[in-house]
Amino acid sequence: MLIRALPLCLALLLAATAQAQDNRQIAQGQRVWQQRCTECHTLDVDDTGPHHRGVFGRRAGSVKGYDYSRALRKANLVWDETSLDRWLTDPEKFIPGQNMDFRVRSKEERAALIAYLKSLSAPAAASPAAAQN
């Protein structure tokens, strides 16, 4: 009986370890966001930049009432891991004519920031970041 339970125990341990790593990355992303993004962005209210809650999966340039550059409004993309990584690496190279003059040079910080932004777009019950904000 013990031998039969071993694969299940290992699977549960691996899942718990992966979840803990995800939570650490989200927490790191929240710190990066607080340190580097809050000068222009908030989670829920448009400021110098548009609000960030729900950005993951949102069409670029689509927040009603926010004055986006023409380039971003016409970009025809949805924010996901790939587009956010390219955007945060070099916004002007990714979408020439956009208005954001900010980069996240560290690949690790970009990945953490993207994980945090993605967690903000998840249903509240499944989002560790939602409980912290």
List where the protein language model places each region:
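Short Fe-S-cluster ligation motifs
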Residues: G65-D85
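N-terminal secretory signal peptides that target proteins for export/translocation
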Residues: M1-I3
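Sequence/structural segment immediately N-terminal to covalent heme-attachment motifs in c-type
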Residues: N23-V45, H52
